[in-house]
Amino acid sequence: GISFGGQMHGLVILDENDKVIRPAILWNDGRTTKECEYLNNTIGKGKLTEYTANIAFAGFTAPKILWVRENEPENFQKIRKIMLPKDYLAYRFSGVHATDVSDASGMLLFDVKNRCWSEKMLEICGISKGCMARVFESYECIGHLTEEAAEKLGLTTDTAVIAGAGDNAAAAVGTGTVGDGSCNISLGTSGTIFISSMTFGVDANNALHAFAHADGHYHLMGCMLSAASCNKWWLDDIIGTGCLLYTSDA
């Protein structure tokens, strides 16, 4: 079978012919400050947490949808499907509009506790449920390769396509971070602290994301959008310079 893991939160919007309407707005795009303020202050952090287990951050998908609605109304009117980056690739392989619970959790459109779309959040964003992909657990088969995909890949049409997971959730499974209370730290373009939990829980201070995880579990995650590059700067420009000066003085 074939599966996908990839960056989370990005907005890919398709028209009635399943054609991409505009370039994807990725996780690290910070244009949605105004939309996040509206969601957190007008809708309210309490309601957002009730609906999705999370508050609005610029990286999440729902604020991006509101940005398109406000700034590109002609594109907003064309939307027939809303997808995440890895799920669009899976669609091109399978012809199926699908997502998994871990990636869906990062959209601010997903009822994390009940592992389904939040009708309240869809209403706030002006999106019908029909625009959303079907949600699967990460290990589930969403379909099989289309004839076109199978021919291009040199595979057969009975090759299963598996839902997969968002990048951090997939990495957590790979590092064995699935047991209750297990934890990992990831330093890349962004930096995360990831804690697996067998039970659903929301951070009362809204500092951590609460997402669905493997095997019916959940996870809490703290994230910074800039991580390894900051470490490199510290090592190269601060620690490195300091060491050179110390050596020179000696």
Residue ranges of each PLM-predicted region?
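A conserved helix-loop-beta module that forms one wall/lid of the active-site cleft
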Residues: G126-E137
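Glycine-rich phosphate-binding loop of ATP-grasp-fold ATP-dependent ligases
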Residues: R22, D103-L108
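N-terminal glycine/serine-rich phosphate-binding loop of ATP-dependent small-molecule kinases
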Residues: G1-R22, E50, K78, A133, ...
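Active-site core segments that coordinate phosphate-bearing ligands/cofactors
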Residues: T33, N40-A98, L108-E119, E123-G126, ...
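Residue-level structural signal for beta-strand termini and adjacent loop
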Residues: I25-L26
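Carbohydrate-associated surface elements
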Residues: D29
